[in-house]
């Protein structure tokens, strides 16, 4: 439909004002159906006779703009009339914004494209396409930027600029958009406070990604100015230093009538909103926070008898909501919000348990494939926004194989796996040829065990040798590729042989007498830090990835428990050790020790942030320290979902639900709950593609009760603590032991 449409832009530079492209049409007879097909390089909203079409925000989203931009299809039948005005309001969005650390602007100017198909009841069809006959106007949006907020002036004089200019600069391919960011929830302020500095601040009680809607009536020309923050400082004052250069400032100029304001082309990450300027009669009733994220069905649930653990689960859910705004971001508030691959891969399994994220990840992974280098390399963030020349990093770039596999395993869609398989294979081939040693990944600028606590105060890089981590992930990637090939009926004998050789080379280079050792060719970032062979992360990776021989297991587990004891029962792991440490313990007979880590309240721990009042997952274990001070000012997000990956352990061990090899989509599962008296009871549930699956256990005085619901199409092997097993199919069951 868009083949005959032209990309159009403003005929002249109009500064930061959002342009509006208009076309007046006459509808000649009774309409059977009217459909719009719209996209923009920037962001857009479509209006028909002044009414918004659809419910998407920030369309067309963030894609690999060098390769593709998405268009949406709207049914506008109910909006057209005899005399119809078509209007496309545009903003900078991701494409025309100083985005990422490199402050990249993808396109020189905003442009839009649209086609409209009107089908009449008499069988005739009419096509209207964007071209130079469309007219361009200014708008009330004087400024908008994803990082910096929006300025809307209801008193602005909207001016006709002239006819649109045809934009003849190169544009990427147009592909249909299927996943949309939408408004999801509305939250009223929990309270309005005065800080010690005298600031008037709204507390919405929840850290979110979204924006604030203001409904107000005041004098014409009066202003409302809103600043956004995630936390208050230790004195109770408004705190924005961790936003870095992101201003997150919304300014609204009142018309003198009843006004409704909210950003159109910006969003913020916040819990607190400071009212910097407002009419005198403003109250908390004038404000509503609106949560936005990609439209995803909630499928998972968890509750137990431990209030702190329930709050942690809530924080994990909110962390996912806040960072699944079109792409999987690191954070939704500061001048970053990029599609970091490492964060996404460690959280992917948890994400697929909480929401149906197949469509979400399909979009993002499609851009990853488009940006995969010819040699198979994958950048650290997708879409790529420059910076560091796209250097590759183990555990980050491995998202190319881990994410497709985890999504397939969660939902069982072989076509999804088949689509992304070429990227997976190319990635493993890249690592295979990346270094001087065929079966090791040596050298390169890896992030390593990012933000681990075992390399010294204030260090970003953990103590675990990065060549060790990279080579361990090489083995993990090859192992996953072999599973993917088996699922797709592709011969995997070469990949199995590759994995065997990687394991042998890894053990020769990085292990001696069954324990980790340092490899002499250490390379990586030049940050001065202590590098250690035996760390919590190195042991967890060996145990979880299966890089040990069976006779070595007990000593490795004992060493891991000893390190935990030496650190006072605390984890020192970072981004790449944390996802696996609990699994490494519980899968090898140390369930209590895993529970102890999960339920620990002192820093560093998952429940420390809960005790500090967190409503999302933090970037640092001690983002807010015991004394109320902050870890740092420049890199301290309080909505950073990666450590929320712990829920996949909770689901697999508290709930006991694990997908067995060959049982993708919960077709074949094991159920082995590990109970703990500190929880009292627990219930895990998920809406699988087969139906509702749930496991509940409760500890009574003399026994533990287990209640299971198994959907049709699922075969389950249930194991009781005594070792007794039951093979179950569709039905509801109760066991007592």
Named regions from a protein language model:
Residues 86, 152-153, 335-336, 354, ...:
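C-terminal capping/lid segments that line or modulate ligand- or cofactor-binding pockets
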Residues 35-37, 211-230, 275, 343-371, ...:
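Alpha-helical support elements that line or immediately flank enzyme active sites
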Residues 44, 53-56, 60, 368, ...:
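Active/binding-pocket-proximal capping segment
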Residues 56, 471-489:
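Conserved, charged catalytic cores of large soluble enzymes
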Residues 12-16, 60-65, 75-77, 102-107, ...:
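Alpha-helix capping and helix-loop boundary segments enriched in small/acidic/polar residues
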Residues 43, 133, 137-138, 282-315, ...:
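Active-site acid/base region of carbohydrate-active enzymes
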Residues 1-334, 342, 359-362, 379-386, ...:
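Extracellular/oxidizing-compartment recognition motifs
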Residues 108-117, 127-156, 165, 173-186, ...:
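Non-catalytic C-terminal accessory modules of carbohydrate-active enzymes
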């Amino acid at each position: 439909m868009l083949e005959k449409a032209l990309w159009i832009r403003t005929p002249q530079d109009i500064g930061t004002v959002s342009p509006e492209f208009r076309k007046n049409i006459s509808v000649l007879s009774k309409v059977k159906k009217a459909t719009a097909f719209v996209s923009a390089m920037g962001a857009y909203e479509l209006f028909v006779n002044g009414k918004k079409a659809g419910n998407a925000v920030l369309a067309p989203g963030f894609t690999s703009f060098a390769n593709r931009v998405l268009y949406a299809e709207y049914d506008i039948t109910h909006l057209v009339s005899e005399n119809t005005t078509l209007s496309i309001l545009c903003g900078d969005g991701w494409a025309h914004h100083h985005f990422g650390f490199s402050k990249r602007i993808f396109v020189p100017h905003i442009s839009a494209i649209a086609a409209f198909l009107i089908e009449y009841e008499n069988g005739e069809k009419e096509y209207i396409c964007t071209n130079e006959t469309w007219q361009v106007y200014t708008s009330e949006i004087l400024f908008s930027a994803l990082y910096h907020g929006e300025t809307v002036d209801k008193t602005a004089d909207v001016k006709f600029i002239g006819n649109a200019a045809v934009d003849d600069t190169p544009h990427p391919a147009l592909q249909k958009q299927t996943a949309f960011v939408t408004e999801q929830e509305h939250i009223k302020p929990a309270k309005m406070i005065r800080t010690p500095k005298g600031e008037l601040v709204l507390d919405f009680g929840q850290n979110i990604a979204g924006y604030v809607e203001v409904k107000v009536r005041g004098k014409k020309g009066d202003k409302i100015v809103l600043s956004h923050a995630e936390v208050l400082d230790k004195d109770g004052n408004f705190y924005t230093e961790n936003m870095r250069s992101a201003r997150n400032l919304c300014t609204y100029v009142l018309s003198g009538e009843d006004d409704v304001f909210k950003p159109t082309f910006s969003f913020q990450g916040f819990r607190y909103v400071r009212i910097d300027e407002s009419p005198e009669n403003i109250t908390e009733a004038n404000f509503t926070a609106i949560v936005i994220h990609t439209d995803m069905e909630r499928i998972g649930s968890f509750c137990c008898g431990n209030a702190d653990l329930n709050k942690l689960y809530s924080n994990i859910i909110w962390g996912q909501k806040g960072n699944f705004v079109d792409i999987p971001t690191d954070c939704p508030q500061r001048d970053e919000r990029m599609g970091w691959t490492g964060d996404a891969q460690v959280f992917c399994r948890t994400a697929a348990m909480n929401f149906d994220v197949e469509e979400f990840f399909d979009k993002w992974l499609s851009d990853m494939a488009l940006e995969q280098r010819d040699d198979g390399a994958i950048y650290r963030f997708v879409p790529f926004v420059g910076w560091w020349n796209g250097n590759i990093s183990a555990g980050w770039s491995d998202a190319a194989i881990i994410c497709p596999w985890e999504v397939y395993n969660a939902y069982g869609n072989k076509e999804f796996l088949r689509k992304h398989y070429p990227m997976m294979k190319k990635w493993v081939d890249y690592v295979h040829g990346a270094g001087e040693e065929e079966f090791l990944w040596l050298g390169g600028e890896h992030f390593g065990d990012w933000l681990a606590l075992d390399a010294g105060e204030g260090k970003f890089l953990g103590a675990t040798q990065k060549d060790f981590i990279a080579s361990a992930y090489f083995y993990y990637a090859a192992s996953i590729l072999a599973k993917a090939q088996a699922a797709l009926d592709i011969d995997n004998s070469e990949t199995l042989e590759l994995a065997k050789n990687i394991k042998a080379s890894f053990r020769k280079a990085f292990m001696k007498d069954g324990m980790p050792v340092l490899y002499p060719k250490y390379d990586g970032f030049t940050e001065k830090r202590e590098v250690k062979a035996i760390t919590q992360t190195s042991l967890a990776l060996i145990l979880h990835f299966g890089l040990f021989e069976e006779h070595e297991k007990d000593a490795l587990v004992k060493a891991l428990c000893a390190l935990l004891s030496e650190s006072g029962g605390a984890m020192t792991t970072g981004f790449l050790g944390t996802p696996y440490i609990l699994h490494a313990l519980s899968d090898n007979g140390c369930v209590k020790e895993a529970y102890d880590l999960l339920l620990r309240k002192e820093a560093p721990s998952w429940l420390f942030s809960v005790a500090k009042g967190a409503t999302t997952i933090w970037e640092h274990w001690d983002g807010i320290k015991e004394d109320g001070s902050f870890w740092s000012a420049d890199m301290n997000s309080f909505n950073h979902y990666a450590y929320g990956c712990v829920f996949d352990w909770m689901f697999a061990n508290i709930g006991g639900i694990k997908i067995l090899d060959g049982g993708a989509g919960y077709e074949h599962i094991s159920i082995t709950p590990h109970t703990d008296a500190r929880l009292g009871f627990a219930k895990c549930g998920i809406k699988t593609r087969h139906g509702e699956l749930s496991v509940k256990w409760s500890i009574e005085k003399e026994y533990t009760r287990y209640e299971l619901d198994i959907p049709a199409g699922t075969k389950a092997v249930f194991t009781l603590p005594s070792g007794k097993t039951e093979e179950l199919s569709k039905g509801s069951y109760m066991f007592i032991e």
